[in-house]
Amino acid sequence: MSIVVENSTVLSALTEKFAEVFGDTKEVEYFFSPGRINLIGEHTDYNGGYVFPASITIGTTGLARLREDKKVKLYSENFPKLGVIEFDLDEVEKKDGELWSNYVKGMIVMLKGAGYEIDKGFELLIKGEIPTASGLSSSASLELLVGVVLDDLFNLNVPRLELVQLGQKTENDYIGVNSGILDQFAIGFGEVKKAILLDCNTLKYEMVPVELRDYDIVIMNTNKPRALTESKYNERFAETREALKRMQTRLDIQSLGELSNEEFDANTDLIGDETLIKRARHAVYENNRTKIAQKAFVAGNLTKFGELLNASHASLKDDYEVTGLELDTLAETAQKQAGVLGARMTGAGFGGCAIALVAHDNVSAFEKAVGQVYEEVVGYPASFYVAQIGSGSTKLDVE
């Protein structure tokens, strides 16, 4: 899969930078990997539930070419002070202080471990447009970028699902975050103006046209610093696993995603701990909420869809406790504005971004009003972007 890139100015600048860093631009190939938003279905992916994400046009661009030796040379426009990071193909152990290059190493390790031959070094220059710690999946975007780069340079012909799974494996086993498959799947399988209803239990999925009529999806960035590995993400993972384990003493289930709300409520005595009950209740209710939301979305009932966004945020705040002052201020202020059908945090939480479904004609006033309240409450400004739904990770045709 390849697309003709639209932003030639960005590529021209990156091409010049590649020549400056690596000497020339002979045989350079161009790649792009998006970020993602999750419309609804939060913290359900690692609980065997449904998610409803879409890839966005903000992402990570890469320029790459093969070398004849085994040296890997990396440069990021986002971290110029790090300069060129260099390592040998046979020395791919994770290193502290080399945060972004660890994702490259991880993908090399996972692809080689899956039996794919990567026998030469390469040069890779990247530029990420996704704000770090925004909850728009800058790490998964980079993993899938590296995946499509290596797939192309070495003619590996890796099936897209396997590439997505190796991206998740990099996150879980190499980086050390117990994430589900939502981010990598959305980024690997994304299509222009389509969202993905994904059953994370079976990996069956449905592409759903995004028909918003007179509404826009506005991304609201808290600009709060956050690192997923330092957050309570892994703690929530462990809590829902423990709740599942306790419910399995009587129920024949493999994941919380198999339960209806009624089945869950009838068996909370098995869990016996109020915190664990709250965590599991969010996973179950959010999963069922996501299925209802997708049906409303397809039917064009954006009002109902918006109400479910609001309910999702409330559950993430009260039961899963992953929001905090910044996300609550954005989402709850957004919900009160004219022309807004719904708003919720998106991503892992603990900072990052929220999204709102806003009438197109109200967007400017919305951003001003929410931005003003946020800065008054939090003490620094939020950032706002209107989301554009774009393609998944791909090689670019540069003419």
Swiss-Prot record:
Residues involved in substrate binding: E42, H43, T44, D45, Y233
E.C. numbers: 2.7.1.6
List of residues binding ATP: S76, A133, S134, G135, L136, S137, S138, S139
Places the protein is found: Cytoplasm
Marked site (Transition state stabilizer) residue numbers: R36
Keyword Nucleotide-binding (UniProt): yes
Residues that hold Mg(2+) according to the record: S139, E171
Pathway involvement of the protein, from the record: Carbohydrate metabolism; galactose metabolism
Catalytic residues in the record: D183 (proton acceptor)
Listed GO CC annotations: cytosol
Function: Catalyzes the transfer of the gamma-phosphate of ATP to D-galactose to form alpha-D-galactose-1-phosphate (Gal-1-P).
Subunit architecture: Monomer.
Family classification: Belongs to the GHMP kinase family. GalK subfamily.
Name listed for the protein in its UniProt record: Galactokinase
